[in-house]
Amino acid sequence: MQRGPFALAVVACVLSSTLASSAQALPSIHIVTLPVDSGAEAFYAADQGFFKNAGLDASIDVMPNGGATIAAVSSGAADIGFSNVFSLAQAFNHGVPITLIAGAGLATQTSPTALVVVDASSPVRTAKDLSGKTFAVDALKSITELAPRAWIDKNGGDSSAVKFLEMPFGEMAVALAQHRVDAALLPEPFLTRAQATVRSIGDAYPAVAKQFLIGAFFTTTTWAKAHPDLLKRFVAAIHETAPWANRNRAQTAAILAKNSKIDAATLGAMRRVMYAETLAPDVVQPVIDIAAKYHVIDSDFAAKSMIYAE
């Protein structure tokens, strides 16, 4: 049967409407993350279509620090966020109703991404040499202070005899060269940028554990209970992303360069994190334990209690 122009127009309109509705059918989630290697999986998942594969329309906003992402998620301004596990453990310990839903960057002995450094001309060679010295960290009472403390104490030094100073990572190499500080914990990409002027004297993170989670994706317990399907889809997307990212370093470097202030040359040269392909309590517990040991949180607790369980 031949259709007239009007009938064809109606069919076209219906098809157009159906396609538009189909295109709008993906549920949306709002993610907040940081422009850093350890938290870059959201960028990779968006770029490679892993969120769409999981049936999600994901919008991503970049925040200045982990505290800002925790504030955004806990206030309801965002659905899911990325932050460092140390800050998340502190927030959880203080009663903020958050839950970890997927792992991100791992600290491992095989791929160290932050080292204890001194100026290249410094006489400091060992942890013992740091007694009476000044040590720069980006934040006091954080993993970047406690890991060096543990490293000093485990290697014949006394961390109580070391003065820790707060300083932005970007200023540390200059401060070392000017002898304003004696040592620093310098992570990537700052480590690669400063390699001509600094010398490593140790890897502090293994003093916490052979392997532990640097960062994780999280949400509130309220959002998790209200949106179990969206949560499953997000976790599925990240679980697809992690092994892909671990295998495709050149592609991840290019994606991260587009979403951060780290230039492609530095990304190509620097040490990169490995991404956790599962979320297990045993890679979270060391962070909680070190915080309790150095009295940054008032009591130790089981990592399992802050990991989402259906």
What are these model-derived regions, one by one?
Residues 9-18:
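Bacterial N-terminal signal peptides
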Residues 291-310:
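Conserved C-terminal helix/tail region of periplasmic/extracytoplasmic solute-binding proteins
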Residues 25-155, 166, 182, 188, ...:
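Short, glycine-/small- and polar/acidic-enriched structural segments
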Residues 224-296:
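Secondary-structure end/capping motifs
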Residues 1-9:
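Bacterial N-terminal signal peptides that target proteins for export
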Residues 86, 164-165, 170-255:
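Pocket-lining segment of extracytoplasmic ligand-binding domains
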Residues 47, 74-75, 93, 153-157, ...:
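Sec-exported extracytoplasmic/periplasmic mature domains
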Residues 19-25:
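Sec/Tat signal peptide C-region and signal peptidase I cleavage site
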